């Protein structure tokens, strides 16, 4: 993935939901994708050309191999499209099953043609054998999680970096103790009081926490902070002298960014909570990055610097430097090296 400029970075924070567009750069920047697809195309051409010649000169050519060859090219086109739209991670389970079917087709065709006489049949069998080898490599890659050692090693050569692992993030989220507010409703007048009155729940059942931790700040929480105004007190309704409830209520549909101040947001980053919970991962800076002077939320770092990071689901990660400075960093400038290792 190309390094975003300032305008693109701001757009990413304003619109955190990914927009999948057709880009050949998504394919050509991934050496594994471009090399495996190229080899698969060469093998398919050999198998198809050999099959055409063999079928025209021999009645012993297995007829079911034609569907296997057509199925293989359709699958290759699908892989190409998914890579170009950057949707490969969403369809890995489907691809694993589809490749298993293709592997059965190509191996059966190879078994039928390998022992037939003639160079034409031999060329066709060589093509389907190569396709079988590529299919089993794809099954191993697409069937493994992105956090597996083999996939991390393969993705380390990609210009886009190591792909996000849903399994690894789920495990990290499940290890965070959820916060349950004491004597404060979700319509509390003061959101800050919810944070200070919250205590970790003694037991959390299920794979995900029952409630989101207040220490976890997603990339969507940064929307609108670039032009944040000075802190303003919430408007009070009614007469202060009366005993009526004069609190400002916030409903579930409130964005929360309209009255969130820059100081409150940075306070979430510098919260005195458990560091290992807020920043469970360790990342190494691949390049030197200088924060934008107009963006109070970006943090600078040097090449080779070790950073603690959290919220690794987006393009911008929450990070903490060794000197205690916290902020957000571009994910394509760093590489995950472990969890709680420094």
Swiss-Prot record:
Cellular component aspect of the GO annotation: plasma membrane
Record keyword Iron present: no
Keyword Magnesium applies: no
PROSITE patterns the UniProt entry points to: SH3 (PS50002)
One Pfam match: SH3_1
Membrane topology of this protein: Multi-pass membrane protein
Subcellular location, principal: membrane
Annotated transmembrane regions: 32-52, 63-83, 94-114, 122-142
Residues exposed to the Extracellular side: 53-62, 115-121
GO BP terms: regulation of actin filament polymerization
Cytoplasmic side: 1-31, 84-93, 143-342
Compartment(s) of residence: Cell membrane
Residue span, SH3 domain: 278-339
InterPro entries reported for this sequence: SH3-like_dom_sf, SH3_domain, Sho1_SH3
Keywords of the record: Cell membrane, Membrane, SH3 domain, Stress response, Transmembrane, Transmembrane helix
Record family assignment: Belongs to the SHO1 family.
Assembly mode: Forms homooligomers.
Matches recorded under PANTHER family: FCH AND DOUBLE SH3 DOMAINS PROTEIN (PTHR15735), HIGH OSMOLARITY SIGNALING PROTEIN SHO1 (PTHR15735:SF20)
Function, in words: Plasma membrane osmosensor that activates the high osmolarity glycerol (HOG) MAPK signaling pathway in response to high osmolarity.
Protein's name in the database: High osmolarity signaling protein SHO1
Organism: Lachancea thermotolerans (strain ATCC 56472 / CBS 6340 / NRRL Y-8284)
């Amino acid at each position: 993935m190309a390094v975003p400029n300032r305008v693109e970075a701001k757009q990413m924070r304003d619109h955190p939901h990914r927009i999948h567009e057709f880009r050949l750069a998504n394919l050509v920047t991934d050496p594994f994708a471009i090399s495996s697809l190229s080899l698969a195309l060469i093998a398919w051409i050999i198998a198809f050309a050999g099959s055409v010649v063999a079928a025209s000169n021999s009645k012993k050519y297995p007829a079911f191999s034609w569907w296997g060859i057509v199925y293989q090219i359709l699958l290759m086109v699908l892989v190409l499209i998914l890579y170009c739209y950057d949707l490969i991670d969403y369809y890995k389970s489907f691809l694993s099953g589809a490749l298993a079917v293709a592997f059965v087709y190509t191996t059966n065709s190879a078994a039928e043609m390998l022992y037939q006489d003639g160079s034409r049949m031999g060329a066709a069998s060589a093509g389907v054998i190569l396709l079988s080898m590529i299919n089993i490599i794809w099954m191993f890659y697409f069937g493994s999680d992105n956090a597996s050692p083999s996939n991390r090693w393969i993705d380390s050569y990609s210009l886009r970096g190591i792909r996000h692992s849903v399994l690894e993030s789920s495990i990290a989220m499940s290890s965070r103790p959820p916060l349950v507010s004491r004597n404060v409703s979700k319509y509390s007048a003061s959101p800050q009081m919810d944070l200070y009155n919250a205590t970790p729940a003694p037991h959390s059942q299920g794979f995900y926490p029952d409630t989101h931790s207040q220490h976890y700040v997603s990339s969507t929480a940064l929307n609108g902070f670039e032009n944040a105004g000075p802190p303003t007190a919430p408007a009070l309704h009614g007469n202060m002298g009366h005993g009526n409830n004069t609190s400002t209520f916030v409903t579930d549909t409130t964005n929360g960014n309209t009255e969130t101040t820059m100081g409150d947001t940075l306070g979430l980053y510098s919260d005195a909570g458990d560091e290992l919970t807020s920043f469970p991962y360790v990342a190494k800076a691949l390049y030197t990055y200088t924060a934008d002077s107009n963006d109070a939320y970006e943090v600078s770092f040097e090449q080779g610097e070790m950073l603690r990071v959290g919220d690794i689901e987006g393009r911008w990660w929450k990070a903490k430097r060794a000197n205690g400075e916290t902020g957000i960093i571009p994910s394509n400038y760093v590489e995950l090296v472990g969890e709680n290792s420094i």
